[in-house]
Curated annotation (Swiss-Prot):
One of its GO terms (cellular component) is endoplasmic reticulum. It is a multi-pass membrane protein. It comes from Bos taurus. The keyword Mitochondrion applies. May function as a regulator of the EGFR pathway. Probable tumor suppressor which may function in cell growth, proliferation and adhesion. It comes from the Eukaryota. Belongs to the TMEM8 family. This is Transmembrane protein 8B.
Length: 472
């Protein structure tokens, strides 16, 4: 990933000690006044792809009218080729003394170029460089080169007087410029619409911007296909407010005495809302805590909601149900730490919970010798609609959702999953608190245990019997 080929690709001398202007005529030698030394720079490494170059007695540079100033910047192999080389020239207008002075800079690789007194160019034969210009009208010039070639870069600065396209050598005006050169991972840290990431391809390490919200370019500054502020706000509101569909399942769970399940649904609704508020690209972002924490809690709440709903449908013994709830929370936390975006993090717990549900319903059906749940109304008005809604949500999530339609397909996913919980959550088990006439409760040490009616109160009050005597 080298720089553009406009700089030439012919083998050149590695580092000449000085810059010479070609003499007139064949065999002639350059006069001594046309030989200028190359001024080295100091290198200060701060971090990966973060290097500052300092010049002696800088950062201001005085440019006398009779000769240019040449600086050498050394980029090391591997360490510097994956960043962005930035150069900034700033003209000190107060040093011009009302002269019409223009400062030209020419940045070339491996071989310096001399700037003439008349026509100013930054190319010669097969060698080309980057030209910078500062004057009283335009005081600052900036240049950025992503993924620069390693080796020695030469910056030649020359001050000339007059108005273009032809200039003349200044007589008594000494221009002063401020030079700032550094190597950074990304262009302007990718701005508000991007994130600078350190990447590796085979053995090549480099940094690049990951742009969001439709922005493009080296520094995420190209807004040709960018999303508008209104569109960003709409997508954020849809993803956040769609989680309010969990409110009906929470109310239904509390009314049915499923307090633990209601707590899990509330946890999921809260962290899913604020995770999507923090996860949005662009500037419509609101984070109440660290992004990684919000993402973990959102994923854990989503998986736990599926887990507790299916386990509640199995109608297991309270002790077994509590053990499965706790075991599921611990195993899901471990799985999310291992691979948060893995497919089996969603399918594995769901299939295991469905296996428990199928086993519990099969055992209960065999013991009762009829289908469980026993009422056709529950199958027709609860289980079938809930299963269809949940299946549709899974199909949308797995096969329809893309990066382009994420904001509204994922919002529909929120609403469908929350709606399916309201259908699938089983009704409250009815309990008959009436004690048979032949039984008398003991006031000290024992209590009567009455059978709980499991399905919609199908057994009448007269059918309640004392099942056992439990030690308190």
């Amino acid at each position: 990933m080298n720089m553009p080929q406009s700089l030439g690709n012919q083998p050149l001398p590695p580092e000449p000690p000085s810059l010479r202007t070609p003499a007139e005529g064949p065999g002639a030698t350059s006069p001594p006044e046309h030989c200028w030394p190359v001024r080295p720079t100091l290198r200060n490494e701060l971090d990966t792809f973060s290097v500052h170059f300092y010049i002696f007695f800088g950062p201001s540079v005085a440019l006398p009218p009779e000769r240019p100033a040449v600086f050498a910047l050394r980029l090391l192999p591997v360490l510097d080729s994956g960043g962005v080389l930035s150069l900034e020239l700033q003209l000190n207008v107060s040093s011009l003394r009302q002269e019409n002075v223009t400062v030209f800079g020419c940045l070339t690789h491996e071989v310096p170029l001399s700037l003439g007194d008349a026509a100013v160019t930054c190319s010669k034969e097969s060698l080309a460089g980057f030209l910078l210009t500062v004057s009283a009208a335009s005081r600052v010039a900036r240049l950025r080169i992503p993924f620069p070639q390693t080796g020695t870069w030469f910056l030649t600065l020359r001050s000339l007087c007059g108005v273009g396209p032809r200039f003349v050598r200044c007589r008594n005006a000494t221009a002063e410029v401020r030079l700032r050169t550094f190597l950074s991972p990304c262009v302007d840290d990718c701005g508000p619409y991007g994130q600078c990431k350190l990447l590796r391809t085979h053995n090549y390490l480099y940094a690049a911007c990951e742009c969001k919200a439709g922005w493009r370019g080296w520094g995420c500054t190209d807004s040709a296909d960018a999303l508008t502020y209104g569109f960003q706000l709409l997508s954020t509101l849809l993803l956040c407010l769609s989680n309010l569909m969990f409110l009906p399942p929470v109310v239904l769970a509390i009314r049915s005495r499923y307090v633990l399940e209601a707590a899990v649904y509330t946890f999921t609704m809260f962290f899913s809302t604020f995770y999507h508020a923090c996860d949005q690209p662009g500037i419509v972002v609101f984070c109440i805590m660290d992004y990684d924490v919000l993402q973990f809690c959102d994923f854990l709440g989503s998986l736990m909601s599926v887990w507790v709903t299916v386990i509640a449908m199995a109608r297991l013994q309270p002790v077994v149900k509590q053990v499965l709830y706790l075991l599921g929370a611990m195993l899901l936390s471990m799985a999310l730490q291992l691979d948060r975006h893995g497919l089996w993090n969603l399918l594995g717990p769901s299939l295991f919970a469905l296996g428990i549900l199928a086993t519990a319903w099969t055992v209960r059906s065999v013991r009762r010798r009829h289908c469980y749940p026993p009422t056709w109304r529950r199958w027709l008005f609860c289980l079938c609609p809930g299963s269809l809604i949940a299946g549709s949500a899974i199909l949308l999530y797995a096969f329809v959702e893309t990066r382009d339609n994420y904001f509204y397909i994922h919002s529909i996913w929120h609403m469908l999953i929350a709606g399916s919980v309201g259908f699938l959550l089983p009704p409250r088990a009815k309990t008959d608190r009436r004690v048979p006439s032949g039984a008398r409760a003991r006031g000290c040490g024992y209590q009567l245990c009455i059978n709980e009616q499991e399905e919609l109160g199908l057994v009448g009050p007269g059918g309640a019997t004392v099942s056992s005597i439990c030690a308190s």
